[in-house]
Every structure is written in structure tokens, then in C-alpha cells.
A protein has these predicted regions:
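C-terminal engagement/docking regions of AAA+ P-loop ATPases
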Residues: 54-55, 64-67, 71, 75-118
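Short alpha-helical "recognition helix" segments of helix-turn-helix
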Residues: 47, 51-52
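Histone-fold modules and their flanking histone-like tails across chromatin and transcription assemblies
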Residues: 1-46, 93-118
Length: 118
């Protein structure tokens, strides 16, 4: 997938999640892990542990900061952008649901853009 970090940054900003939140960075890390894996990692504990090792933070910090960023974006975003990237219209889901849906949407958009260029 074309530069997932850049595409996810644009999506998070579009959803009203500010870059100065720790969760913003951790969500980008999760998107990179999913891309390296070729699919979302279903055990979020593994994702949190990998990010915690990379960032030298504890797992609960990673989980809570991602959750806070998602909640913040959910309450400050235009509905259309939120549904586009997270797929759920203000219905509480798990971090894993949100991140997997976002990664899948970015992957689908990337595939559509490649098809348009042909």
C-alpha cells in the first residue's frame, strides 16, 4: 500500500484527531503493523505490545491513548469523514474494530486509485 503513514495521517486529521495526541502516533504505528502483516492483526494485545516496545511505553498507555484519540475524533468529526474512515456512525466499538476498518478503507482507496491510473 502506498505510504500508509501519510495516508493514515490525512485520514486522522480529516476525522478531527489532532497530531499532538499520543494516540495519533500510535494509530499510525498500528496502520504500519497491519500493512507489514498484510492484514489487520486481530489480537490487539499483540499490537499494543509491539507499539509499546517501539515507543518504550507501557501497554495500557498505548491502549488508552488510542482509545482517547478515537473518542476525541468521534466527538469532533464531521459524520461523513468519520463514516468514511471508521465505518461506524458514533456507535462505540473496540479500538481493534476502528483500526481494522480504517486500514481496510485506506487499502480499498489505494486499490481504486491504482485502477483509475490505468
Amino acid at each position: 500500500m502506498a505510504n500508509i503513514r501519510e495516508r493514515a495521517t490525512d485520514a486522522l486529521l480529516d476525522c478531527g484527531i489532532p497530531m499532538n495526541q499520543s494516540g495519533f502516533l500510535y494509530i499510525l504505528d498500528a496502520m504500519e503493523l497491519f500493512t507489514e502483516n498484510g492484514a489487520p492483526i486481530t489480537n490487539m494485545r499483540v499490537v499494543y505490545e509491539m507499539i509499546a516496545r517501539k515507543r518504550k511505553h507501557n501497554v495500557s498507555e498505548i491502549m488508552e491513548n488510542i482509545k482517547y484519540s478515537i473518542i476525541f475524533g468521534n466527538s469532533n468529526c464531521r459524520t461523513g469523514a468519520w463514516v468514511r474512515y471508521f465505518g461506524f456512525d458514533f456507535v462505540p466499538k473496540t479500538n481493534g474494530n476502528y483500526l481494522a476498518f480504517m486500514w481496510e478503507r485506506l487499502r480499498e482507496e489505494d486499490a481504486r486509485n491504482k485502477n483509475k491510473q490505468r
